[in-house]
Amino acid sequence: EQVIARNPQVALVLPEQEFDRQLVLAGPSSHLTLEGLHMDFMRLTHEGAQYREVPHYGCILEYDGFRVLIAGDCAVADPQLRDFIGSRPIDLALWNFPLGTIRKGRHFIEQAIRPEHLVVYHLPFSHDDRWGYRDAAVKGAGQLQGVPDVRLLLEPFQREILT
């Protein structure tokens, strides 16, 4: 609600009705274009058996030929995500950290996504990391092969500039 109040021009796209002024995703896939930004959405399987029924979509954003993949909380190595990407080159993949800490997830990144840049997010803050997730994410990132640029968002409000 704060985002909408501060940015009244924003367009919210969600899989369930949450706000009065939003677009609701429905069906297996959707496409939306706003001012030159092309957005492809695909229903994906949510990670975790207890969340399988939660509506979840991945998204490929494209602007001026630059493609960004946001897979969100999709299942590790989801074949639907592989199909969704197809042969499209991915310039930047925003990747939820747990998916890159296991071999199956790293292999999927290397073989199916093949991004030029990978930004790993959703890591706990250092004072909240009682299970060692940050160290596991750093180790997993170091084991990725064939991804030219891997970055981890480890600090609050961290900013990265891609070149």
Map each language-model feature to its residues.
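Active-site metal-binding motif and surrounding structural segment of the metallo-beta-lactamase
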Residues: 1-13, 85-94, 114
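Binuclear metal-ion centers of metallo-dependent hydrolases, dominated by the metallo-beta-lactamase
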Residues: 24-35, 53, 83-87, 107-163
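A short, conserved beta-to-alpha structural element at the edge of catalytic cores
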Residues: 92-111
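Redox-cofactor binding/interface segments in oxidoreductases and associated redox assembly factors
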Residues: 40-42, 95, 120
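Active-site HxH/HxHxD metal-binding segment of metal-dependent hydrolases
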Residues: 1-31
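Metallo-beta-lactamase
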Residues: 9-16, 62-72, 91-95, 126-129, ...
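Active-site environment of divalent metal-dependent phosphoester hydrolases
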Residues: 1, 19-21, 32, 49, ...
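Core dinuclear metal-dependent hydrolase active-site scaffold
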Residues: 22-88, 100, 155-163
